[in-house]
């Protein structure tokens, strides 16, 4: 078991190196959403109920400098409290980007406008923040770095919309976590690129009713996973299907 654990850690390290995640950087962190993180549900990535989608409470909203117009949705970051004296707690926590922290140009960036460009900032779910700092701190300096996401099961595809407007929510992405591109294929069509509608909702205007559906997902590190015929021909809008994984 010990050898298996070491091999797994080495595998993650190789993934991080291959993706070019880089080293530690400096930012600040605050918290929102309440003690049960119920206020973090929904959000600009489109994940909806973070509990049922498997993201839980280890999540964060990213400032403009990190959010990248939604392209960063699903990426994972390791954070540790940095130089905040008695407010810091030892250790680190890994969070998934699930929301956007909007700028507040009415306040200076060092006094309330924490998410103003070009500041990197994490507005963490309260339970996640309390892993690295005390509640009374309110805001703390942190060190952060991109890390590979670890997920259970395969990439999930929730097919919403209607005929000629297929809106597919892509969730539970391991590895890089974020998604660069998605393609869709019906059993009677070829591969067709989808466009990012918002967050991790991807759009196709093709008529695909009554066809089995396949998906091809490419992450920001260039790796691609193809999930063939994951949705049977009788699929209905609102259903979720599980494919392969990175």
From Swiss-Prot:
UniProt domain Expansin-like CBD: residue ranges: 164-243
Keywords, ordered alphabetically: Cell wall, Disulfide bond, Membrane, Secreted, Signal
Residues of the signal peptide: 1-18
Biological processes annotated in GO: plant-type cell wall loosening; plant-type cell wall organization or biogenesis
Transcription in keyword set: no
Induction record: By gibberellin (GA3), submergence and wounding.
Start and end residues of each Expansin-like EG45 domain: 42-154
Disulfide bond residue pairs: 45-73, 76-149, 81-88
Principal place of residence: secreted
Topology term for the membrane: Peripheral membrane protein
Phenotype of gene-disrupted mutants: Plants are smaller.
Protein's cellular compartments: Secreted, Cell wall; Membrane
SMART domains: DPBB_1
Family of the protein in this entry: Belongs to the expansin family. Expansin A subfamily.
Record's protein name: Expansin-A4
Lineage: Eukaryota, Viridiplantae, Streptophyta, Embryophyta, Tracheophyta
Gene: EXPA4
């Amino acid at each position: 078991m010990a050898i298996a654990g070491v091999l797994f850690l080495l595998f993650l390290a190789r993934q991080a190196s291959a993706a070019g995640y880089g080293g530690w950087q400096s930012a600040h962190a605050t918290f929102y959403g309440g003690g049960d993180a119920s206020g973090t549900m929904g959000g600009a990535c489109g994940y909806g109920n973070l509990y049922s989608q498997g993201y839980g409470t280890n999540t964060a909203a990213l400032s403009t400098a990190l959010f990248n117009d939604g392209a960063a949705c699903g990426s994972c970051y390791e954070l540790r409290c940095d130089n905040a004296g008695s407010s810091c707690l030892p250790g680190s926590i890994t969070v998934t980007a699930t929301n956007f922290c909007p700028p507040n140009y009415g306040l200076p960036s060092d006094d309330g406008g924490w998410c103003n460009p070009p500041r990197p900032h994490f507005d963490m779910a309260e339970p996640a923040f309390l892993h690295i700092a005390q509640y009374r701190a309110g805001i703390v300096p942190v060190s952060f770095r991109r890390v590979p996401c670890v997920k259970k099961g395969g990439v999930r595809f929730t097919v919403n919309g209607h005929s000629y407007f297929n809106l597919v929510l892509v969730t539970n992405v391991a590895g890089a976590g974020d998604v660069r591109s998605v393609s869709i294929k019906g059993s009677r069509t070829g591969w067709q690129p989808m466009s990012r509608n918002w967050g991790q909702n991807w759009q196709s205007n093709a008529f695909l009713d009554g066809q089995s559906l396949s998906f091809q997902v490419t992450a920001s590190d260039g790796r691609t996973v193809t999930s063939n015929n994951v949705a049977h021909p009788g699929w209905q809008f609102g259903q979720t299907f599980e494919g392969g994984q990175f």
